[in-house]
């Protein structure tokens, strides 16, 4: 063994030693290389598509869009989720490897939006199907808001503990076979209620048939008086 000393090498190696934990190293590597699966169904996805341009340049965050859920660790749902699309969304989430994250973008994804009141086929919130990490409200959210949501997700990943993530996986498991959607008959048929539509305010207590029958039997001068 050659006993030649390398003082410069020893000094350089001593000054460049980094001590960390395996958990912090894993978090640092994941937060800088998020690979999103873009699940866009409505106008909110158009706002996210503007991030690809040079004005916002989302490549600087390490985002690499993937077309396969098996290669993604982040799914971004943007737009309305219907009952027929719900099993497909859950299956995509199940096919993603652990650890995986979800960003719910837009009012339609979070609460159902304007379709949540009288729509029979809209899911009232994607968190009823899969666990959501970051909620991004808006109709639609601006690209700056999307960047802020990604930044908050990166901060969450940096503070994450491996034990907590394993514990949450046992609680927030979503299986496709457990989601049984029953489509019930809606009371909103789309037909106008003729009694409400043609009923004057002054004759609200008079049935429609009696009112029009009396109106046709009375002459014009009597109506004027």
From Swiss-Prot:
It is a peripheral membrane protein. Binds 1 [4Fe-4S] cluster. It catalyses: a plastoquinone + NADH + (n+1) H(+)(in) = a plastoquinol + NAD(+) + n H(+)(out); a plastoquinone + NADPH + (n+1) H(+)(in) = a plastoquinol + NADP(+) + n H(+)(out). GO terms for molecular function: 4 iron, 4 sulfur cluster binding; iron ion binding; NADH dehydrogenase (ubiquinone) activity; quinone binding. InterPro entries: NADH_UbQ_OxRdtase-like_20kDa, NADH_UQ_OxRdtase_20Kd_su. Belongs to the complex I 20 kDa subunit family. The gene is ndhK. GO terms for biological process: aerobic respiration; electron transport coupled proton transport; photosynthesis, light reaction. NDH shuttles electrons from NAD(P)H:plastoquinone, via FMN and iron-sulfur (Fe-S) centers, to quinones in the photosynthetic chain and possibly in a chloroplast respiratory chain. The immediate electron acceptor for the enzyme in this species is believed to be plastoquinone. Couples the redox reaction to proton translocation, and thus conserves the redox energy in a proton gradient. One of its GO terms (cellular component) is chloroplast thylakoid membrane. NDH is composed of at least 16 different subunits, 5 of which are encoded in the nucleus. The keyword DNA repair does not apply. [4Fe-4S] cluster binds at residues 43-44, 108, 139. This is NAD(P)H-quinone oxidoreductase subunit K, chloroplastic. Keywords: 4Fe-4S, Chloroplast, Iron, Iron-sulfur, Membrane, Metal-binding, NAD, NADP, Plastid, Plastoquinone, Quinone, Thylakoid, Translocase, Transport. It is found in: Plastid, Chloroplast thylakoid membrane. PROSITE patterns: COMPLEX1_20K. Its main location: plastid. Transmembrane segments: none annotated. The keyword rRNA-binding does not apply. Its cofactor is [4Fe-4S] cluster. Its EC number is 7.1.1.-.
């Amino acid at each position: 063994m050659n006993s030649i000393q390398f003082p410069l090498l020893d000094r350089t190696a001593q000054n460049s030693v980094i001590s960390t934990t395996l958990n912090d190293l894993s978090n640092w590597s994941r937060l800088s290389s998020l690979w999103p699966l873009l699940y866009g169904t409505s106008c909110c996805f158009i706002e996210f598509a503007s991030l690809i341009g040079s004005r916002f340049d989302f490549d600087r965050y390490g985002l690499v869009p993937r077309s396969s859920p098996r290669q993604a660790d982040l799914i971004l749902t943007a737009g309305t989720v219907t009952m027929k699309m719900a099993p497909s969304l859950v299956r995509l989430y199940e096919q993603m490897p652990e650890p995986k994250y979800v960003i719910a973008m837009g009012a339609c994804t979070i609460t159902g939006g304007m379709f949540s009141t009288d729509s029979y086929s809209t899911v009232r919130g994607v968190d009823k199907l899969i666990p959501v990490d970051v909620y991004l409200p808006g109709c639609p959210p601006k690209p700056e808001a999307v960047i802020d949501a990604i930044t908050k997700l990166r901060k969450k990943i940096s503070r994450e503990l491996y034990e907590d993530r394993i514990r949450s996986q046992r609680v927030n498991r979503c299986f496709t076979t457990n989601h049984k959607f029953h489509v019930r008959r809606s009371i909103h048929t789309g037909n106008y209620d003729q009694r409400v539509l043609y009923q004057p305010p002054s004759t609200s207590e008079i049935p429609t048939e009696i009112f029009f029958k009396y109106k046709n039997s009375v002459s014009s001068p009597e109506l004027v008086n």
